[in-house]
A protein has these predicted regions:
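Histidine-/acidic-rich catalytic cores in large beta-rich domains
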Residues: 7-425
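Positively charged n-region of N-terminal signal peptides that target proteins for export
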Residues: 1-4
Length: 425
């Protein structure tokens, strides 16, 4: 009996000694980033295993980036007294991409298309364009070209020479304009432009505009934005951006459909996000008519209001994220700025002035999108806004809120990511 007791005590002492040695070894050699030798690396692997299992489980449970958590306090608003039909796209239960014409007032689906095959979980169909005879022009952010399908989902054409990101708009006649990447020599965009500063070379991504024939998909016009800036003495806009590898970030090409005193049919307005500038460009003679800069940053979605006015979604955000407190949280607050919010900015060519009507209403409702975002002026004067980052849709009548909504998804607690909602007839 005594012998068994001694053996038990001895075993406990040995186990405690081994645990003590193991704990000392982990503390001494097994800290990630400080591990030395084979023994240290072994300890890191051993002690990190539970974390790896947890991380793997979280990754399995994580939803693709095409879904957005719905805020627990979200309350929809629908005071619409008329129909608004919008073209939306989202990831459906089968993992394909649905494109729909949906009535915001009733949530009824009027028309639908489905894109199948070759899709990765994060792929988005951004800003699809409804053409005549219920044809749909579309592309994914997977850089595999631009497609067109008919009303029953049959592919009509596939333009492989350019990739699309992020907007496409109807042009004059059976044409369309797209923001594009050149894929004629590679299957993906590359940082193919370089400049030198202080003996250091910097490479960056070029952007293109392209005009397509909507009947065939043939490219009618294509222009490099990097070359355009260089050819017109505007290369300073490249180093104005804090995003060195993406200093242009073309996010909209808006065609002029009717001539006026300040613009000609066939002109286009180009929105460069990371340099916070809008160019008025005339492809017919390769001339830049205006460089528009002012009290706006990271803007998107230029729209033509009338013959002398344009408007655009002013994200009113820095072009690159920084520390939340700017790294100076220990300094006393001497001056506090009002909160920044996104809004719609108007530019009048006649007076060369900016305005932002109903800005307070947008601010009071918390409208803010660090990236992306768009708006559309409705025929009755109301305004539809896509607050893209949280993926909320808004309709305002001057300073009154008429609609606040989401695209509900099949995942509880999540709604669909918005992909540049378009108002259609």
């Amino acid at each position: 009996m005594r012998s068994k007791l001694l053996n038990g005590i001895t075993s406990v002492i040995i186990v405690l000694a081994l645990l003590s040695f193991y704990g000392w070894s982990v503390r001494k050699h097994g800290i990630p980033g400080k591990a030395q030798g084979l023994w240290g690396k072994f300890l890191v692997t051993l002690t990190s295993f539970p974390d790896l299992v947890t991380q793997a489980a979280e990754e399995v449970e994580k939803l693709p980036g095409t879904f957005v958590p719905t805020h627990p306090a979200f309350e929809p608003v629908n005071r619409l007294d008329y129909d608004i039909n919008v073209l939306v796209s989202y990831s459906n239960e089968e993992g394909n991409r649905a494109i729909e014409v949906r009535n915001l007032k009733t949530q009824a689906v009027k028309k639908s298309w489905e894109v199948k095959g070759g899709l990765k979980p994060h792929h988005r169909i951004m800003h699809p364009l409804l053409l005549s005879n219920d044809r749909i022009a579309y592309a994914t952010n997977g850089y595999d070209g631009i497609y067109c399908m008919n009303a029953v989902g049959e592919q009509l054409w596939h333009q492989k020479e350019i990739g699309h990101h992020p907007s496409m708009n109807a042009g004059i006649g059976e044409t369309m304009w797209v923001c594009a990447y050149d894929l004629s020599e590679a299957s993906h965009p590359s940082n193919g432009v370089v400049y030198e500063m202080g003996g250091v070379k910097y490479h960056f991504l070029d952007n293109y505009i392209a005009q397509l024939d909507t009947e065939t998909g043939a490219i009618l016009f294509k222009r490099s934005m990097a070359e355009l800036l260089l050819d017109h003495g505007l290369e300073h806009l490249i180093i104005k951006s804090v995003v060195v590898d993406d200093p242009i970030h073309l996010n909209d090409v808006e065609p002029v459909l009717e001539s006026s005193e300040y613009m000609l049919a066939g002109d286009v307005f180009l929105s460069f996000r990371t340099s916070s500038v809008i160019l008025h460009y005339r492809p017919s003679n390769d001339s830049i008519i205006r460089v528009i800069e002012g009290p706006f940053t990271s803007q998107h979605d230029v729209d033509i209001v009338d013959g002398q006015t344009i408007a655009f979604f002013n994200n009113n955000a820095p072009t690159k994220r920084f520390k939340e407190d700017g790294g100076r949280n220990k300094e006393p607050n001497l001056l506090k700025y009002p909160a920044y919010s996104s809004h719609i900015k108007y530019y009048d060519f006649a007076s060369q002035t900016f305005s932002a009507p109903n800005r307070e209403a947008y601010s009071q409702n918390g409208v803010y999108s660090f990236t992306e975002g768009l708006f559309e002026l409705l025929p009755n004067g109301d305004v539809l806004i896509e607050e893209q980052n949280p993926s909320l849709l808004w309709v305002f009548r001057q300073d009154s809120l008429l609609f606040k909504g989401i695209l509900p998804s099949h995942h509880e607690g999540y709604h669909h990511l918005l992909n540049w909602t378009r108002v259609v007839d």
